[in-house]
Amino acid sequence: GTLNFLNGVPQFAISIGYEEKGEIISGIIFDPIKDEMFFAEKGGGAFLNNSRIRVSNKNKLKDSYLVTGGPKADSKKREGIFEEYTKISNIVDAPIRKFGSAALDIANVACGRFDGYWQWELKYWDIAAGIIILKEAGGFIEFIESNEKNSLKKNIIATNSKIHQELMGSLLKKNIE
């Protein structure tokens, strides 16, 4: 959401994740435009403005509403990402959305607005808070290992857990590796 913020696009958030001994134990994502605050603490559930949230119940990829992020200009995966987008677009009934804020995209999966999200080459600090919020809302997040050693970039799939394997199986193998 940094580029959105810098360019006046109202889709960005303040996102803070707290990690202790290698585990994220709390997180908060604040959307100042909509005045929405997502937060979670390990074992305490996930909330949106003090109301408990849960992921959606959709269990088929075809019926799912998905969101993704786009490739950076210097991404080695750029060509494959567009191919992947097209492949998944041909599976799902609803159009795939792209808003440009990883933190909000994960938060929106956590509260059931979307059923799944995937993106490659994210910075950890952009998704740390979303990890605990999604898990506490009943979702699943998977980190896909990069071939780049010691990379700060993260490849993730975040879902309601019911469509996770189907989405993972639909992504292009060359982008996962």
Where are the predicted features?
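DPxDG-like acidic metal-binding loop motif
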Residues: 1-47
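Short loop segments at secondary-structure junctions
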Residues: 19-23, 33, 42-45, 51, ...
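Short hydrophobic/aromatic-rich beta-strand segments that constitute the beta-sheet cores
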Residues: 39, 46-49, 68, 116
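An extended, acidic
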Residues: 54-177
